[in-house]
Amino acid sequence: MNLFRKYKHKDGFTRLVQPGEMGMRLVDFGLLNLKDGRSFKEDTGKNEVVLVILSGRCRIASGGEEWHAVGGRKNVFEGRPYSVYIPSDSEYTVIGSGDVELAVCKAPADSKRKARLITPEDTNVLSRGRDNWYRDVYEIAGLKKDTEALIVGETISGPGNWCSYPPHKHDLEEAYFFKVNPEQGFGIQRVYTDDRKLDELYVIETNTVVAIPEGYHPLVAAPGYSVWFIYVLAAGQNQVLEAHNDPVHNWLANAKKE
């Protein structure tokens, strides 16, 4: 099963992951690129949506609310993001304030919440792992904090470091969208199950996406390059997020620090 796709930059919205493809049933993910003054309008339907500004600024309106000059990062490696939550059965409009790139994250939900701006200060900053599997995590939304079903965040792994390690799974659908710094760099992503009915290995580069319908999903950044990715999970109405380590490698969780 192919779980990999490469995004080719273009103006407007590009859907990269959707239900019915790559083993996915719930997660819907795409990229929105707008020039100054250009707009994009959408009805969320039965999905709730989290818009994450990856770079640039924009104006976003929904549910009688309007936020101006949202964003400001030059790129995803420069600090925490601005994001906006949009509930199901709502319309929203995005207008570029200069060039802007957004991640559009969706999952089915019966949401009664209101549209809301999520500032960098609202994100939860975590440092996970140790040794050469240390990474920084920005928890943007989820676990009943801002959403009903979606869990969205960003992770940055330093040169030569591993993520999602020791290898673990969540028993939830996920999608990862990547950027690498410097841009010509790369990393490696593996997705596999205990019985190896699913066992895929991909070279991840800037603007690539990997769908994770199930299984363990460790990844590593090549030496000399940092890997950033946005993660999108569909947790369902219960929003239970548990990490289950691969039993073969679980000894690492209790090993002495190097």
Specify the residue positions occupied by each region the protein language model found.
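Non-transmembrane, aqueous-exposed alpha-helical and coiled segments at domain scale
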Residues: 4-5
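A short glycine-rich, His/Asp/Glu-containing loop-to-beta-strand
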Residues: 9-41, 131-175, 186
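Extended, compositionally biased flexible segments
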Residues: 29-95
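Short glycine/proline-enriched turns and hinge-like loops at secondary-structure junctions
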Residues: 44-45, 96-98, 169-170, 222-225
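Glycine- and acidic-residue-biased ligand/ion/polar-headgroup-sensing regions
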Residues: 45-68, 86, 171-208, 220
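Conserved metal-binding segment of the jelly-roll/cupin
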Residues: 77-97, 107, 203-224, 233
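Short, structured patches in soluble enzyme cores that scaffold and shape functional sites
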Residues: 88, 96, 104-108, 141-142, ...
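Double-stranded beta-helix
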Residues: 100-138, 192-193, 230-258
